[in-house]
Amino acid sequence: LKLRDMTREELLDAIDKKYKAMGQDPDVHLSGLLYAEPMKYWDFIQVDALLGLQTQRTQLPDEMVFIMYHQINELIFKMILWEIEQVSKADPISTQKFAMHLGRISRYFDLLSNSFDIMGEGMEPEQYMKFRDTLTPASGFQSAQYRKIEFASTELINLIDNRFRATIDRNTPFEHAYDHLYWQAAGKDYETGAKSKLLLNFEDKYFEEFITFMKDYNTLNLWTKFKSLPK
């Protein structure tokens, strides 16, 4: 029965049962409604907090575009991870539900792909080259959510540098596999083991979180869930 189809009595009865099941007094919650302020859009979306997150390091106008664009990307990454989580938690999962969430993920990636012109056409190259130097050694490479999307989308072996895949299997410790991920090559000298400041900062912040995430999605990633779908 949908909430909008309930009579007033049925709705009150449902509320009564809900709070009693939680060991709480339904009347206390109902009386609280007498004093609660109606929800407002700007409070629900937390607009003031959201619009206060853009802090420039220079006075160059296009730096603001750069900051907002990447913050929007991170929000979309969060939407993608949210959909992947719904798939991974569903046990079992139907083909219909899998396809629904995958369709949402695909649309989010379409949104990202279609936004590249904001970077290419929406900023003056001269301004970008100036404020970019103030961000060193920070890089979009350090987007933890992007890396998590990779971990949650496929089996770990598919993210290993091709040069080392033959040495990695299901019994390989996650820490060892992590050190041989394809993107490690962007900041690591495999002959000396030396890592760039960019990679060291990234790992100082997220290494433990990444290892936990890799373990969590080892058998719950999108590819593994897809293979478990009914034939």
Predicted regions and their residues:
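Surface-exposed peri-terminal alpha-helical interaction modules
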Residues: 2-231
